[in-house]
């Protein structure tokens, strides 16, 4: 991997472990992209961002990134992908970036919940008036540098690492990195050891 971006993230900081930590809680953060038209071939949409669903198990030792599900889907399929991830991982919290795309997907997600009788709350994630670069650096750089992020191996690894090592680069997508950075707003873990 070449760090063609700002070289904010270094290859030596990347750790892999396929073994799920025994302790911790799951969190899911979603960065929505624009939606494809139903039945669209996607040829003209090649340069659109992906919707990205980051699934992380957090504990006092850091974040274990189970997977990042990503792709370009219509709004119904996006809602189904989110629902399937929540059903599989049973997270403590689910968050979707605030905005028009969130408003578009919520009725479909609510409909799936009603039909399946499986309900969960969806938190609204906000960028807090921070520029994306600042927000991503704040939530991820120190964690990676200090070994507090471990990646599960999966097909998503190459796309994620490409985006991470080239961040920030206007010519490269950053949706997988962005969704992972939003975990910061959901994962409330105490890093303080028990003192006698």
Where do the protein language model's features map onto the residues?
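Conserved phosphate-binding/catalytic loops in two-lobed NTP-binding clefts
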Residues: 117-136
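RNase H-like, metal-dependent nuclease domains and their acidic two-metal-ion catalytic environment used
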Residues: 1-123, 149-196
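Short, surface-exposed amphipathic charged segments that create phosphate/polyanion-binding patches used
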Residues: 134-146, 164-167
């Amino acid at each position: 991997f070449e760090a063609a971006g700002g070289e904010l993230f270094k290859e030596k900081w990347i750790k892999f472990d396929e073994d799920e930590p025994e302790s911790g809680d799951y969190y899911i953060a979603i960065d929505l992209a624009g939606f494809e038209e139903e039945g669209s071939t996607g040829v003209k949409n090649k340069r659109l961002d992906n919707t990205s669903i980051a699934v992380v198990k957090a504990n006092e030792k850091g974040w274990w990134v189970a997977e990042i599900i990503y792709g370009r889907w219509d709004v119904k399929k996006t809602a189904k992908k989110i629902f399937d991830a929540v059903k599989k991982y049973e997270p403590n919290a689910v968050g979707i970036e605030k905005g028009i795309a969130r408003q578009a997907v919520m009725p479909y997600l609510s409909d799936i919940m009603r039909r399946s009788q499986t309900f969960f709350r969806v938190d609204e994630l906000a960028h807090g008036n921070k520029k994306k670069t600042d927000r991503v650096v704040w939530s991820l750089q120190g964690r990676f540098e200090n070994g507090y992020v471990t990646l599960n191996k999966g097909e998503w690894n190459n796309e994620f690492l490409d985006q991470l090592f080239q961040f920030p680069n206007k010519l490269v997508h950053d949706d997988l990195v962005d969704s992972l950075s939003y975990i910061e707003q959901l994962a409330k873990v105490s890093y303080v050891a028990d003192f006698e």
